[in-house]
Swiss-Prot record:
Family statement: Belongs to the FliQ/MopD/SpaQ family.
Name of the coding gene: fliQ
Function: Required for the assembly of the rivet at the earliest stage of flagellar biosynthesis.
Cell location: Cell inner membrane; Bacterial flagellum basal body
Membrane topology reported for the UniProt record: Multi-pass membrane protein
Highest taxon listed in the record's lineage: Bacteria
Keyword annotations from UniProtKB, A to Z: Bacterial flagellum, Cell inner membrane, Cell membrane, Membrane, Transmembrane, Transmembrane helix
Entry-linked Pfam families: Bac_export_3 (PF01313)
Protein name as catalogued: Flagellar biosynthetic protein FliQ
InterPro entries: Bac_export_3, FliQ
Main location: membrane
TM annotation in the entry: 16-40, 55-75
Annotated source species: Escherichia coli (strain K12)
Length: 89
């Protein structure tokens, strides 16, 4: 196992983790921004008001993007296990 192969595996793992987290984080960011704009427009300064819409939006995003996320993760793990004998020795 060379340092290059370890770096390659780590880089690929970080890319997959970023690809899995990005859609959910973007949905939470956009939902929070919309709720904050509505709170500023109506002058409602309740901090807990944005949590429920964010949770609902992220849950819907998981339902919609879940199969894609699962396929991406399974492809990565399948590739990792397939290449494991070549990486080890």
């Amino acid at each position: 196992m060379t340092p290059e192969s370890v770096m390659m595996m780590g880089t690929e793992a970080m890319k997959v983790a970023l690809a899995l987290a990005a859609p959910l984080l973007l949905v939470a960011l956009v939902t929070g921004l919309i709720i904050s704009i509505l709170q500023a427009a109506t002058q409602i300064n309740e901090m807990t008001l944005s949590f429920i819409p964010k949770i609902i939006a992220v849950f819907i995003a998981i339902i919609i993007a879940g199969p894609w996320m699962l396929n991406l993760l399974l492809d990565y793990v399948r590739t990792l296990f397939t290449n494991l004998p070549y990486i080890i020795g």
